[in-house]
Amino acid sequence: MELAPKEIFEQLLKWFVVPTFDLVIEIENTGFVLVKRKIEPYKNQWALPGLRMYKGESINESVARIAKQEVGLNIDVSKKILIGQYVGKFKTENQRQDLSTGYYLKISKGATVSINPNHFSKCNITYSIPGNTGAMYKYYLEKAIDLR
């Protein structure tokens, strides 16, 4: 799959909304997988694993890729539950705007999380929402807590 060069992608952010997926992954009886971001937007804040959709991917392919690429988990996407959408407007160089779709996924206890070190500095598996959590992620976590 060919991706736009970073310079071109950054320029497109000035005019286009980016479709993204964010995953509330609950490890059974343990907590939600939270990650501390190293990159913008939400740099140095607690977040959920998430990335943009690539051209040619189905929703299920995107969700599976994100779980594997961002936190090293192979998930059964057929059991995903739509929990909402969120429009993120960011004070970045190009005034980036994302249309995020959030999905809830529950996986078996004992799953091993392996974070993407290029994107995240830490992982926290908890049922609490840390104070330094990005607004979009807090919204999705609150929705997921209501589902439990």
Give the role of each language-model region:
Residues 1-22, 28:
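Acidic, metal-coordinating catalytic segment for phosphate/diphosphate chemistry
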Residues 1-8, 81, 92, 97-99, ...:
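Small, basic N-terminal interaction modules of short regulatory proteins
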Residues 16-20, 43, 48, 96-100:
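Short connector loops at helix/strand junctions that flank enzyme active sites
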Residues 17, 59, 133, 137:
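Hydrophobic (often cysteine-bearing) scaffold residues that line and stabilize catalytic clefts
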Residues 31-70:
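Conserved Nudix-box catalytic region and its N-terminal flanking loop in Nudix hydrolases
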Residues 72-111:
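Active-site segment of metal-dependent pyrophosphate-handling enzymes
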Residues 102-104, 112-148:
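NUDIX/MutT-family hydrolases
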